[in-house]
Amino acid sequence: MQNINRTIGQASSFGNKKLRAYTNFVMIYLKSFHIPSESEENGFFIDYSGNNKLTCYNSFYPFQVFPAKGLSDMTFSEITIFAGGNGSGKSTLLNIITERLGISRTSLYNKTDFHSMYMPLCSGEFGIYDRTQMRELMSVSKFITSDDVLSHLLDVREKNDNLDFKRKIWLENRREYIINPGQGPREIDMDDPESIRKYREFNEQINTSRSFSQTLRRNIGTNERTFSNGETAIKYFSDKIEPGGLYILDEPENSLSSEYQIDLAKFIESMARFYDCQFIISSHSPFFLSMKGAKIYDLDAQPASVKKWTEIPNMKLLKDFFVEHNDEF
Protein backbone atom coordinates (compact mmCIF):
# COMPACT_ATOMS: atom_id res chain seq x y z
CA MET A 1 0.00 0.00 0.00
CA GLN A 2 2.79 2.39 0.90
CA ASN A 3 4.52 1.90 -2.45
CA ILE A 4 1.42 2.48 -4.53
CA ASN A 5 0.38 5.53 -2.52
CA ARG A 6 3.81 6.96 -3.22
CA THR A 7 3.38 6.12 -6.90
CA ILE A 8 0.08 8.01 -7.04
CA GLY A 9 1.57 10.90 -5.14
CA GLN A 10 4.47 11.16 -7.55
CA ALA A 11 2.20 10.88 -10.58
CA SER A 12 -0.25 13.47 -9.29
CA SER A 13 2.56 16.02 -9.03
CA PHE A 14 2.62 15.83 -12.88
CA GLY A 15 6.40 15.96 -13.16
CA ASN A 16 7.60 19.31 -14.44
CA LYS A 17 4.28 20.32 -15.98
CA LYS A 18 3.25 23.85 -15.10
CA LEU A 19 -0.07 23.85 -13.26
CA ARG A 20 -2.44 26.73 -13.70
CA ALA A 21 -4.35 28.15 -10.74
CA TYR A 22 -7.19 25.77 -10.03
CA THR A 23 -10.61 26.73 -8.82
CA ASN A 24 -12.15 25.97 -5.46
CA PHE A 25 -15.31 24.63 -7.08
CA VAL A 26 -15.87 21.57 -9.21
CA MET A 27 -15.64 21.86 -12.96
CA ILE A 28 -18.40 20.42 -15.11
CA TYR A 29 -17.27 20.71 -18.71
CA LEU A 30 -19.90 18.43 -20.23
CA LYS A 31 -23.26 19.53 -18.82
CA SER A 32 -25.55 17.21 -20.75
CA PHE A 33 -25.71 14.71 -23.58
CA HIS A 34 -28.59 13.69 -25.81
CA ILE A 35 -29.09 10.38 -27.59
CA PRO A 36 -32.07 9.76 -29.89
CA SER A 37 -35.36 8.95 -28.23
CA GLU A 38 -37.70 6.24 -29.45
CA SER A 39 -39.65 8.72 -31.57
CA GLU A 40 -36.45 10.08 -33.11
CA GLU A 41 -35.23 6.59 -33.95
CA ASN A 42 -38.61 5.72 -35.47
CA GLY A 43 -38.45 8.88 -37.56
CA PHE A 44 -35.00 7.92 -38.80
CA PHE A 45 -36.12 4.43 -39.85
CA ILE A 46 -39.16 5.81 -41.66
CA ASP A 47 -37.00 8.23 -43.64
CA TYR A 48 -34.20 5.73 -44.23
CA SER A 49 -36.40 2.82 -45.27
CA GLY A 50 -38.07 4.98 -47.89
CA ASN A 51 -35.00 4.72 -50.10
CA ASN A 52 -33.25 1.64 -48.71
CA LYS A 53 -34.04 -1.99 -48.07
CA LEU A 54 -33.43 -2.99 -44.44
CA THR A 55 -34.06 -6.72 -44.82
CA CYS A 56 -30.34 -7.44 -45.23
CA TYR A 57 -29.60 -6.27 -41.66
CA ASN A 58 -30.17 -8.31 -38.53
CA SER A 59 -28.85 -5.55 -36.26
CA PHE A 60 -29.15 -1.77 -36.34
CA TYR A 61 -26.71 -1.17 -33.48
CA PRO A 62 -26.37 1.33 -31.84
CA PHE A 63 -29.99 2.02 -32.73
CA GLN A 64 -32.63 0.19 -30.67
CA VAL A 65 -30.41 -0.08 -27.57
CA PHE A 66 -31.51 2.79 -25.35
CA PRO A 67 -35.16 3.62 -26.22
CA ALA A 68 -36.31 0.54 -24.30
CA LYS A 69 -34.50 1.97 -21.27
CA GLY A 70 -36.27 5.30 -21.60
CA LEU A 71 -32.87 6.97 -21.76
CA SER A 72 -32.49 10.01 -23.97
CA ASP A 73 -31.16 12.99 -22.03
CA MET A 74 -28.42 12.81 -19.40
CA THR A 75 -26.93 15.50 -17.19
CA PHE A 76 -23.53 15.21 -15.58
CA SER A 77 -21.79 16.06 -12.34
CA GLU A 78 -18.05 16.19 -11.66
CA ILE A 79 -18.17 12.38 -11.42
CA THR A 80 -20.89 10.51 -13.30
CA ILE A 81 -21.11 6.72 -13.30
CA PHE A 82 -23.10 4.40 -15.54
CA ALA A 83 -23.89 1.25 -13.57
CA GLY A 84 -25.44 -1.95 -14.84
CA GLY A 85 -24.83 -5.57 -15.64
CA ASN A 86 -23.22 -7.06 -18.73
CA GLY A 87 -25.06 -5.97 -21.85
CA SER A 88 -26.72 -3.00 -20.16
CA GLY A 89 -25.12 -0.56 -22.60
CA LYS A 90 -22.49 1.03 -20.33
CA SER A 91 -19.60 0.72 -22.77
CA THR A 92 -21.80 1.52 -25.76
CA LEU A 93 -22.84 4.79 -24.15
CA LEU A 94 -19.23 5.75 -23.37
CA ASN A 95 -18.19 4.97 -26.95
CA ILE A 96 -21.02 7.11 -28.33
CA ILE A 97 -20.13 10.08 -26.11
CA THR A 98 -16.43 9.74 -26.94
CA GLU A 99 -16.96 9.59 -30.69
CA ARG A 100 -19.55 12.36 -30.84
CA LEU A 101 -17.37 14.75 -28.82
CA GLY A 102 -14.17 13.80 -30.64
CA ILE A 103 -12.32 12.81 -27.49
CA SER A 104 -8.93 11.15 -27.92
CA ARG A 105 -8.80 7.39 -27.59
CA THR A 106 -6.24 4.63 -28.14
CA SER A 107 -8.22 1.40 -28.42
CA LEU A 108 -10.51 0.81 -31.38
CA TYR A 109 -14.03 -0.53 -31.18
CA ASN A 110 -16.37 -2.29 -33.56
CA LYS A 111 -18.72 -0.13 -35.59
CA THR A 112 -21.67 -1.07 -37.76
CA ASP A 113 -22.98 0.56 -40.92
CA PHE A 114 -25.36 2.56 -38.76
CA HIS A 115 -22.81 4.34 -36.56
CA SER A 116 -22.32 7.19 -39.02
CA MET A 117 -26.11 7.65 -39.16
CA TYR A 118 -26.58 7.49 -35.39
CA MET A 119 -23.97 10.07 -34.41
CA PRO A 120 -25.64 13.15 -35.98
CA LEU A 121 -28.70 12.40 -33.83
CA CYS A 122 -26.55 12.79 -30.68
CA SER A 123 -25.41 16.06 -29.17
CA GLY A 124 -23.60 17.35 -26.11
CA GLU A 125 -23.80 20.67 -24.27
CA PHE A 126 -20.62 22.06 -22.77
CA GLY A 127 -20.34 24.57 -19.96
CA ILE A 128 -17.49 26.44 -21.62
CA TYR A 129 -17.81 28.46 -24.80
CA ASP A 130 -14.39 30.04 -25.28
CA ARG A 131 -12.59 28.37 -28.20
CA THR A 132 -9.18 28.54 -26.55
CA GLN A 133 -10.51 26.90 -23.40
CA MET A 134 -12.22 24.24 -25.49
CA ARG A 135 -8.99 23.47 -27.35
CA GLU A 136 -7.14 23.19 -24.04
CA LEU A 137 -9.82 20.87 -22.70
CA MET A 138 -9.79 18.59 -25.73
CA SER A 139 -5.98 18.48 -25.82
CA VAL A 140 -5.85 16.63 -22.48
CA SER A 141 -9.20 14.80 -22.41
CA LYS A 142 -9.07 11.04 -22.98
CA PHE A 143 -11.11 7.87 -23.17
CA ILE A 144 -9.30 5.11 -21.25
CA THR A 145 -10.50 1.53 -21.55
CA SER A 146 -9.53 -1.64 -19.73
CA ASP A 147 -7.99 -2.80 -23.03
CA ASP A 148 -5.65 0.21 -22.92
CA VAL A 149 -4.44 -0.78 -19.47
CA LEU A 150 -3.96 -4.43 -20.46
CA SER A 151 -2.09 -3.40 -23.61
CA HIS A 152 0.20 -1.20 -21.50
CA LEU A 153 0.91 -4.08 -19.12
CA LEU A 154 1.85 -6.32 -22.05
CA ASP A 155 3.95 -3.58 -23.70
CA VAL A 156 6.02 -3.06 -20.54
CA ARG A 157 6.57 -6.80 -20.21
CA GLU A 158 7.52 -7.19 -23.88
CA LYS A 159 9.88 -4.21 -23.78
CA ASN A 160 11.72 -5.57 -20.77
CA ASP A 161 11.86 -9.08 -22.26
CA ASN A 162 13.37 -7.68 -25.47
CA LEU A 163 15.97 -5.71 -23.54
CA ASP A 164 16.86 -8.77 -21.49
CA PHE A 165 17.32 -10.79 -24.70
CA LYS A 166 19.50 -8.09 -26.32
CA ARG A 167 21.56 -7.80 -23.15
CA LYS A 168 22.13 -11.55 -23.14
CA ILE A 169 23.28 -11.55 -26.78
CA TRP A 170 25.54 -8.55 -26.19
CA LEU A 171 27.25 -10.23 -23.23
CA GLU A 172 27.69 -13.47 -25.18
CA ASN A 173 29.32 -11.55 -28.04
CA ARG A 174 31.60 -9.74 -25.61
CA ARG A 175 32.68 -13.00 -24.02
CA GLU A 176 33.39 -14.46 -27.46
CA TYR A 177 35.41 -11.39 -28.52
CA ILE A 178 37.57 -11.63 -25.40
CA ILE A 179 38.22 -15.35 -25.91
CA ASN A 180 38.77 -14.99 -29.66
CA PRO A 181 39.78 -11.37 -30.45
CA GLY A 182 40.31 -12.26 -34.08
CA GLN A 183 36.57 -12.55 -34.58
CA GLY A 184 36.21 -8.79 -34.23
CA PRO A 185 36.22 -6.39 -37.20
CA ARG A 186 39.67 -6.38 -38.85
CA GLU A 187 39.35 -2.90 -40.34
CA ILE A 188 37.12 0.13 -40.28
CA ASP A 189 35.67 2.01 -43.22
CA MET A 190 35.29 5.62 -42.08
CA ASP A 191 32.84 6.27 -44.91
CA ASP A 192 30.51 3.45 -43.84
CA PRO A 193 28.31 4.23 -40.78
CA GLU A 194 27.61 0.52 -40.25
CA SER A 195 31.34 -0.28 -40.23
CA ILE A 196 31.94 2.50 -37.72
CA ARG A 197 29.10 1.24 -35.53
CA LYS A 198 30.41 -2.33 -35.49
CA TYR A 199 33.95 -1.20 -34.67
CA ARG A 200 32.75 1.06 -31.86
CA GLU A 201 30.60 -1.75 -30.45
CA PHE A 202 33.52 -4.19 -30.61
CA ASN A 203 35.83 -1.67 -28.93
CA GLU A 204 33.36 -1.09 -26.10
CA GLN A 205 32.80 -4.79 -25.60
CA ILE A 206 36.47 -5.50 -24.99
CA ASN A 207 37.24 -2.21 -23.22
CA THR A 208 37.39 -2.95 -19.49
CA SER A 209 37.90 0.69 -18.48
CA ARG A 210 34.18 1.28 -18.75
CA SER A 211 31.93 -0.53 -16.28
CA PHE A 212 29.61 -3.23 -17.59
CA SER A 213 26.54 -1.31 -16.42
CA GLN A 214 27.58 1.90 -18.20
CA THR A 215 28.30 0.05 -21.42
CA LEU A 216 25.06 -1.92 -21.30
CA ARG A 217 22.99 1.19 -20.61
CA ARG A 218 24.62 2.98 -23.52
CA ASN A 219 24.22 0.15 -26.02
CA ILE A 220 21.09 -1.65 -24.88
CA GLY A 221 19.11 0.72 -22.70
CA THR A 222 17.53 0.18 -19.31
CA ASN A 223 14.49 -1.82 -18.33
CA GLU A 224 11.35 0.03 -17.43
CA ARG A 225 10.82 -0.19 -13.70
CA THR A 226 8.47 -3.06 -12.98
CA PHE A 227 5.60 -3.14 -10.54
CA SER A 228 2.89 -5.67 -9.92
CA ASN A 229 0.10 -5.71 -12.51
CA GLY A 230 -2.10 -3.71 -10.15
CA GLU A 231 0.60 -1.13 -9.46
CA THR A 232 1.40 -0.79 -13.16
CA ALA A 233 -2.30 -0.38 -13.99
CA ILE A 234 -2.93 2.31 -11.40
CA LYS A 235 0.27 4.13 -12.40
CA TYR A 236 -1.01 4.10 -15.98
CA PHE A 237 -4.15 5.94 -14.89
CA SER A 238 -2.27 8.45 -12.77
CA ASP A 239 0.15 9.16 -15.63
CA LYS A 240 -2.63 9.64 -18.19
CA ILE A 241 -4.97 11.79 -16.10
CA GLU A 242 -3.85 15.42 -16.15
CA PRO A 243 -5.41 18.56 -14.63
CA GLY A 244 -8.23 20.29 -16.44
CA GLY A 245 -9.52 17.39 -18.51
CA LEU A 246 -12.65 15.39 -19.23
CA TYR A 247 -11.91 11.70 -18.71
CA ILE A 248 -14.08 8.80 -19.78
CA LEU A 249 -13.14 5.53 -18.07
CA ASP A 250 -14.57 2.17 -19.07
CA GLU A 251 -14.59 -0.22 -16.07
CA PRO A 252 -11.34 1.04 -14.48
CA GLU A 253 -11.63 -1.65 -11.79
CA ASN A 254 -10.38 -4.30 -14.23
CA SER A 255 -6.83 -5.47 -13.39
CA LEU A 256 -7.09 -3.88 -9.94
CA SER A 257 -7.45 -5.57 -6.57
CA SER A 258 -9.88 -4.10 -4.05
CA GLU A 259 -7.00 -2.28 -2.36
CA TYR A 260 -5.92 -0.59 -5.58
CA GLN A 261 -9.51 0.17 -6.57
CA ILE A 262 -9.83 2.17 -3.35
CA ASP A 263 -6.58 4.00 -4.14
CA LEU A 264 -7.70 4.85 -7.68
CA ALA A 265 -11.13 5.98 -6.45
CA LYS A 266 -9.44 8.38 -4.00
CA PHE A 267 -7.20 9.65 -6.79
CA ILE A 268 -10.21 10.32 -9.03
CA GLU A 269 -12.02 12.13 -6.20
CA SER A 270 -8.94 14.29 -5.64
CA MET A 271 -8.54 15.13 -9.34
CA ALA A 272 -12.20 16.13 -9.58
CA ARG A 273 -12.10 18.23 -6.42
CA PHE A 274 -8.73 19.95 -6.66
CA TYR A 275 -7.55 19.73 -10.28
CA ASP A 276 -10.55 20.69 -12.41
CA CYS A 277 -11.18 17.23 -13.84
CA GLN A 278 -14.52 15.74 -14.80
CA PHE A 279 -15.08 12.00 -15.04
CA ILE A 280 -17.65 9.84 -16.82
CA ILE A 281 -17.21 6.22 -15.77
CA SER A 282 -18.78 2.84 -16.33
CA SER A 283 -18.41 0.55 -13.33
CA HIS A 284 -20.02 -2.06 -11.12
CA SER A 285 -17.43 -1.74 -8.35
CA PRO A 286 -18.67 -0.52 -4.94
CA PHE A 287 -15.42 1.40 -4.47
CA PHE A 288 -16.18 3.61 -7.47
CA LEU A 289 -19.94 3.77 -7.07
CA SER A 290 -19.49 5.08 -3.51
CA MET A 291 -17.23 7.98 -4.52
CA LYS A 292 -18.21 11.32 -3.01
CA GLY A 293 -20.26 13.51 -5.32
CA ALA A 294 -20.84 10.75 -7.87
CA LYS A 295 -24.05 10.85 -9.90
CA ILE A 296 -25.10 7.31 -10.77
CA TYR A 297 -27.30 6.19 -13.66
CA ASP A 298 -28.72 2.70 -13.19
CA LEU A 299 -28.93 1.31 -16.73
CA ASP A 300 -30.62 -1.87 -15.51
CA ALA A 301 -33.63 0.07 -14.23
CA GLN A 302 -36.77 0.49 -16.31
CA PRO A 303 -36.59 3.31 -17.12
CA ALA A 304 -32.90 4.05 -16.56
CA SER A 305 -32.67 6.56 -13.74
CA VAL A 306 -30.40 8.28 -11.23
CA LYS A 307 -30.02 6.37 -7.97
CA LYS A 308 -27.97 6.28 -4.81
CA TRP A 309 -25.17 3.76 -4.97
CA THR A 310 -26.82 1.75 -2.19
CA GLU A 311 -29.92 1.36 -4.39
CA ILE A 312 -28.06 -0.32 -7.25
CA PRO A 313 -29.18 -4.00 -7.46
CA ASN A 314 -25.62 -5.32 -7.60
CA MET A 315 -24.75 -3.42 -4.42
CA LYS A 316 -27.78 -4.89 -2.66
CA LEU A 317 -26.65 -8.32 -3.80
CA LEU A 318 -23.20 -7.75 -2.31
CA LYS A 319 -24.71 -6.51 0.93
CA ASP A 320 -26.95 -9.58 1.23
CA PHE A 321 -23.97 -11.83 0.56
CA PHE A 322 -21.87 -10.31 3.33
CA VAL A 323 -24.79 -10.24 5.76
CA GLU A 324 -25.34 -13.94 5.08
CA HIS A 325 -21.68 -14.66 5.85
CA ASN A 326 -21.33 -12.14 8.66
CA ASP A 327 -20.64 -14.82 11.30
CA GLU A 328 -17.60 -15.98 9.34
CA PHE A 329 -15.76 -12.69 9.77
Label each residue range with its predicted role.
Residues 244-246, 275-280:
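Loop/turn-to-beta-strand initiation segments
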Residues 259-278, 285-329:
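C-terminal lobe/lid and adjacent interdomain/linker elements of RecA-like ASCE P-loop ATPase modules
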